[in-house]
Curated annotation (Swiss-Prot):
This is Small ribosomal subunit protein uS17. The keyword Phosphoprotein does not apply. Part of the 30S ribosomal subunit. The gene is rpsQ. Belongs to the universal ribosomal protein uS17 family. It comes from Streptococcus agalactiae serotype V (strain ATCC BAA-611 / 2603 V/R). One of the primary rRNA binding proteins, it binds specifically to the 5'-end of 16S ribosomal RNA. PROSITE patterns: RIBOSOMAL_S17. GO terms for molecular function: rRNA binding; structural constituent of ribosome. The keyword rRNA-binding applies. The lineage of its organism: Bacteria, Bacillati, Bacillota, Bacilli, Lactobacillales.
Length: 86
């Protein structure tokens, strides 16, 4: 599969405690199948971060890749927005 055909997702880093791995939560909105109300869905993905660049709270872009471990199927492409530390 070519790189431009792989799934690309945007999300927020919720954990960077593992070495070279980040946990990213991706939030989407969908319509309820029966009632039609907009519902917020969120899903967590583990992504490979080779240089430990992303920190907790950052907005990142991740891309689908080959399985890197039992749970990792994505890799970090870029940090879109750094978290503001107060």
């Amino acid at each position: 599969m070519e790189r431009n055909q792989r799934k690309t997702l945007y999300g927020r880093v919720v954990s960077d405690k593992m070495d070279k791995t980040i946990t990213v939560v991706v939030e989407t909105k969908r319509n309820h199948p029966v009632y039609g109300k907009r519902i917020n869905y969120s899903k967590k993905y583990k992504a490979h971060d080779e240089n430990n660049v992303a920190k907790e709270g950052d907005i990142v872009r991740i891309m689908e890749t080959r399985p890197l471990s039992a749970t990792k199927r994505f890799r970090l492409v870029e940090v879109v927005e750094k978290a503001v530390i107060i």
